[in-house]
């Protein structure tokens, strides 16, 4: 949970004092909190030290550090001392527990984490990033957080006989240790190498709608297609305010190819994962763009079917290659037919590229030096044509490209480093990206040149109109650290260079972190970075072939995002990733994005848009009715399994400016299989689920401005999907619901205000938007009136126990409808000149 604003209301419920006895005690082989045993059979080599004995100073803002110090008696550090030869990887028990519910986050791939629950130390998964123990005896929770000490990072692992194990590793056989004073923390901590979200500014894109090119084009992205994509959104009345040109724009090639020429005809992700960057500028597809060529009345034609045809052919090649690989595994020795078919398909794909290229420039090398060519000309033309497009981001890997930087092609000292995967990742899911990266190694720029590396890349991008980057494949560094002082020291060097460049070239905020869900990144890389992905990639279908994956994968994605936000949201703005608006479960995704508290963006293919759905998420000017916090699971979901326990509905809560919101989602039907070590469908759980929602499910004390809303005597509650309006109090019964598979309900809770003659009033907002309450911009009451500013156009709803005498809309009288059940409605226009904001006054 997010830390309470008032330290006196901490989860331990003890008053602040500098002399309070520590809540934890380690003695006689037992680790206890306020007298309640948590771990038994704690080895004698395990130590516990109070927070104040380890953390004596900090570069955090003084009020924050003082706040932490004031409750430091609620925390401390666990360590251990091995009486053996120092090692680069040490495993030690912290004790055992059984019969106590826990929630944890573990890495199921190198880069991605998700939720797991159980009730013993042996129930944990490998590479657990933290574990939250339920302690109902004191109506509280205890967090055990593996951290970083010196040159070692740590993670929790399952042990035998209910033991909870901690693993400390350096990532280099040259970096060894045998003892640690602070390798895990109990409760909360600030370590000087990162900053909390409250200390940083988020990028402007968090309040806006955007488009990412990935699912539309994959690696075949090109200027004409990007242009048409933005145009389709604008013509449809939903203007993107930011866009991400994903993988496919860079100058990359394979080791077997000419070191100074781009690889050609790449389409699907996977083929590029052994390729390396050979220059920091854009590839020829963008490099040859001539300024103004798409601005004229007769731009070059572009076949909107082309991307899907290319993707379809590339998928056929991929399937043929998989068939060949299966034949090899089954003992087939004559592969000539397979190879012949693969070659035939590749030739066909190459012919399709040659016959469908759109000329948007002269193609002459001499033109590339001119100011009106290349990425700069393209971004200028985009912003000239599409006035609302504020930001253009581009993708790159942390090491440059998937395969890093090709040695000898730039001024930097790059060396191809073989990849070494930690034993802790042996239990993770098979991942094509890992397979390909291990196959090719990484062209690593020497960490001494990390500053120069990012400055060279980002300063160029900034000059050509790029305002931010999506940095992907972040956790490859842990594969490469043997010769560079270990994973901690290598990461520090790279994150220092990245943060420095972010501050200089992208206003300090223009970076989305992705494939970064490991504690190395959060403890070492977030001093400047303020937004990052909290879920795995949006998969529109199961890449492993389960046809039902088109449905069950979507609930899995939602669980990733909701539970990862519990810790990631303390440090970065959670980004719930893109989705496709014409997907079979697009509405399911849209409901979660509406209240997630982060940016809303899609990866629609050309012609693949559901504008009716998008209009429920996005205002015509490309802004969004964003919640004021980041969405988190409700307390009654913490120790449950909303994916395949066949009974739990996921509930997430958030705040709007004048109310709270709860989203209830039926995510059942899939999840992690610890034996098969993969995420798969659980079809027997893909059923209707029942649950309940209560106003107290919202953690009103988590934001200072929301505290008074949580003290209301009564609330108007609007159910967006069923269009119901009901009243509720903190003491009333819960609202019961039943949700079909992959469906949801959004509950808006608005405090009721008592006006003259005991009239009760509460504005719900625009009901044609998923986050109705987010449309309310301001609210002022007098004894006889309610004055409301509403952004957007459509159906306005309020609860009013009495009929208003009159209503004024933007200074003029207007009609409205009122019914005895309290529904007060009228239609609002979108007024462009007023940024879509209408002023409503109800007089009583």
PLM regions: where:
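Non-catalytic C-terminal accessory domains or segments of carbohydrate-active enzymes
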Residues: 2-127, 147-155, 164, 637, ...
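Carbohydrate-recognition beta-sandwich/jelly-roll modules
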Residues: 2-243, 247-304, 325, 348-350, ...
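Eukaryotic intrinsically disordered and solvent-exposed regulatory patches
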Residues: 118, 194-198, 217, 228-232, ...
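Aromatic-lined carbohydrate-binding/catalytic grooves of carbohydrate-active enzymes
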Residues: 204-488
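Flexible loop/turn segments at secondary-structure boundaries
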Residues: 217-221, 250-254, 399-405, 476-480, ...
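Substrate-engagement module of ASCE P-loop NTPases
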Residues: 373-384, 493-507
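Glycan-recognition surfaces
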Residues: 405-459, 496-613, 627-649, 654-656
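Catalytic core of carbohydrate-active enzymes
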Residues: 563-565, 571-582, 593-596, 601, ...
